[in-house]
């Protein structure tokens, strides 16, 4: 639901105790390990990493007499989606993704050094044990990810959402588990018999096979569920207003009316969403253009069709 949150935790084991080296020594030691438990939050920032480091410092610790571990157990180890082009500059699909790479531990080590926390150990990967204490928990509302995912057509955000869906079927989250949820929804939407293939969450995969019929079925399914529709409608780009269609349909009846998501690959251009017809009826639509040498031609056609439906 819309109250879902992405969760990233900083945990630790062992105890904090003073150094016994010198009587006057004020050094506080963590006699244990630190764990960063990933939730595939794609919005983690440099400031968030600094907060993680400060949460360890706030324990009174200036030396970690143990190791720092990355807990990536939230999802499988697949770094890329099935059928992605090898020469694309794709983000790494890690439970601890940071700035599109799997380098959160390195960033944390730098932040700890800035907080004058010394690591007397090494870094690695290990699942956080039950009973570990939580130093800090970062919870990010789903809509904070949904909005830029839809408005800006962010592929990493879409993949992170996909794995959250897969997580509802148990750990570790996988693309196949997310696809099982998609298949179940497709049946409920009345399009289960339509020819299709789901491969990833962003649409980058060359193995995806969808039709306009299926997209409209999903849109109608969402429309009938008020909470889902409200969140989706708020997140969709608005013609001539914002997002990926900010510069499209200006000066037409579609401006400010069409709420729709773009889809773009080499030779493919699509647009799907909602608009309100002159009689007040809300329409769900999907337009797919394939085999186009220049995307602008497809977009111009889509814009004209949307304007016609709004008149």
Q: What kind of feature is each model-predicted range?
A:
Residues 99-233:
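A small/polar active-site loop signature that marks catalytic segments
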């Amino acid at each position: 639901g819309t109250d879902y949150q992405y969760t990233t935790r900083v945990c630790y084991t062992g105890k904090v105790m003073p150094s016994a080296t010198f009587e006057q020594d004020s050094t506080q030691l963590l006699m244990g390990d630190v764990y960063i438990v990933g939730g595939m939050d794609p919005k983690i920032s440099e400031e968030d990493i600094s907060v993680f480091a400060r949460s360890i410092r706030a324990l009174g610790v200036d030396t970690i007499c143990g190791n720092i571990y990355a807990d990536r157990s939230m999802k499988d180890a697949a770094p890329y989606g099935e059928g992605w082009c090898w020469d694309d500059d794709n983000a790494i699909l890690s439970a601890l993704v940071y700035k599109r790479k799997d380098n959160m531990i390195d960033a944390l080590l730098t932040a700890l050094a800035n907080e004058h926390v010394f690591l007397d150990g090494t870094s690695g990967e290990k699942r956080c044990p039950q009973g570990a204490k939580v130093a800090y928990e970062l919870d990010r509302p789903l809509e904070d990810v949904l909005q830029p995912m839809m408005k800006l057509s962010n592929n990493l955000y879409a993949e992170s959402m996909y794995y959250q869906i897969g997580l509802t079927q148990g750990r570790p989250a996988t693309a196949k588990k997310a696809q099982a949820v998609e298949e179940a929804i497709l049946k409920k939407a009345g399009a289960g018999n339509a020819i299709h293939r789901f491969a990833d969450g962003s649409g980058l995969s060359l193995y995806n096979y969808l039709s306009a019929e299926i997209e409209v079925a999903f849109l109608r399914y969402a429309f009938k569920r008020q909470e889902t529709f409200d969140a989706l409608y708020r997140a969709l780009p608005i013609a001539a207003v914002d997002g990926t269609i900010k510069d499209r349909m200006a000066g037409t009846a579609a401006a400010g009316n069409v709420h729709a998501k773009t889809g773009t690959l080499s030779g493919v251009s699509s647009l799907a969403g909602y608009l309100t017809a002159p009689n007040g009826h809300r329409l769900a639509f999907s337009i797919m253009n394939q085999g186009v040498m220049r995307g602008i031609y497809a977009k111009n056609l889509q814009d004209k069709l949307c304007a016609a439906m709004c008149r």
